[in-house]
Design a protein with these regions (language model features):
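Short, Lys/Arg-enriched N-terminal segments with co-localized hydrophobic residues
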Residues: 17-29
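Structured soluble/peripheral alpha/beta segments that form catalytic or ligand/cofactor-binding pockets
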Residues: 26-391
């Protein structure tokens, strides 16, 4: 899966809840179409957007990069995220490794930063070698090795009772798809207000991935009597980038399903509930995504994600339907390994907000193909229960 091939430079971008396809040469901004209405929303993406941006004045400005990886032969995976919150003086650094025996290695840190010059904090470094084509991920540090990943629902206890082991990551990402997304703006160049939103810009791309992930000591026996694990990765993954003001509590819930089958077939399905409008009316959850067919993205015009749940309200399986202009898809998913994470924030008036994010490596099947990916479910927790999960 490690091959690289030339690709058309195209994007599927979102604006105002709708998405359209556009393409252009590399050196130009990508816009969905020539607009005459200055209030029309277009999507722009430039090669320099792969670099870090000058932070907005908003206290909650976030610039983040996320990359996942899955090796279908080894049935292992992982994901890596670095979010610079320079106006708050720290980054958010996450490393998550799904081991072949069901254990999970996880680390979260908030290393101090005083600038937004690079994606490099807490031992995790994400480097853009060539915009839209080639990135690398390295990590040198520790992870908490969990026999039972569900223990991370109480992170203080999980980090206090499970062993910390060395972890080394060296991964090389090469594009196998066009770009998806960008920065929505008005056609006349005005920015769209996102102070209380989730991000003002976001894009994604499927990649081939090769490299090595080592968890524990590869030679000696680790603290719980098992050898360390060395995984020579030859697989695929999805990467994304976001920037702009972000609170994890800005959305009511979402379901995000990136998945890979082979270099010619991959997809991402997303359903987002943004809650109640200012006038008190309910918003309809928005569906979006893309399907990689060959070296082209087909826009998802509609999709549904139904899930089975365990007693903790965590996803265990999925049945999905997606529609593109070309055809319909049915996808099933089975959770292989899941770790629950959380984000908490106190509002200026003293309200305690609690967000749960369940991060599950998931086996997917579609059209006779078997693949791997994530099922990432975010929910605000209200009265002790995730709001988008049926009781």
């Amino acid at each position: 899966m490690s091959g690289n091939r030339a690709l058309p430079f195209a994007a599927i971008g979102s604006g105002g809840g709708s998405e359209d396809v556009g393409s252009t040469r590399r050196e130009n901004a990508m816009r969905e179409s020539d607009q005459t209405d200055p209030d029309e929303i277009v999507t722009v993406l430039l090669p320099e957007d792969e670099n870090t941006h000058t932070p907005d004045a908003a206290e909650n400005y976030n610039e983040s990069m996320y990359l996942n990886v899955f090796d279908l032969g080894l049935e292992v995976g992982g994901w890596f995220r670095l979010g610079n919150r320079v106006n708050e003086g720290h980054a958010e650094m996450s490393v998550c490794i799904y081991l072949p025996d069901g254990r999970v290695g996880f680390m979260y840190d908030r290393p101090k930063i005083d600038n937004n010059d690079a994606m490099d904090a807490g031992g995790l470094t994400i480097t853009v070698v060539e915009p839209f084509e080639h990135l690398t991920v390295t990590y040198e540090g520790r992870v908490c090795l969990l026999d039972d990943p569900s223990e991370m629902a109480d992170p203080r206890a999980a980090f206090g009772t499970n062993p910390m082991v060395d972890c080394s990551v060296r991964l090389d990402y090469r594009a196998v798809s066009p770009m998806y997304g960008g920065r929505p703006q008005y056609a006349d160049g005005r920015e769209i207000e996102t102070l209380n939103g989730f991000a003002k810009a976001h894009y994604e791309q499927h990649c081939s991935v090769i490299g090595t992930i080592t968890v524990g000591d590869a030679v000696d026996v680790d603290v719980d009597g098992r050898d360390g694990v060395v995984m020579e990765i030859d697989g695929m993954g999805l990467r994304d980038k976001s920037w702009g003001p972000r609170y994890w509590q800005a959305l009511t819930w979402y379901r995000w399903l990136p998945m890979v089958f082979n270099e010619n077939f991959a997809m991402m399905l997303s359903v987002i509930d943004r809650g109640i409008r200012d006038d008190g009316s309910a918003r309809t959850p928005s569906a979006s995504g893309m399907v990689l067919v060959g070296n082209e993205y087909h826009r998802v015009t509609d999709c549904r994600i139904e899930a089975d749940w365990n007693e903790a309200g965590e996803q265990t399986a999925m049945r999905c339907w997606a529609q593109t202009d070309e055809r319909e898809y049915e996808v099933t998913g089975e959770v292989l390994s899941m770790i629950p994470l959380r984000s908490r924030r106190t509002t200026p008036d003293g309200n305690q907000l609690h967000t749960r994010i369940t991060e599950a490596m998931t086996r997917y099947e579609c059209d006779g193909h078997v693949g791997l990916g994530m099922s990432e479910f975010l929910d605000q927790v209200v009265d002790g229960w995730p709001i988008g999960v049926p009781r």
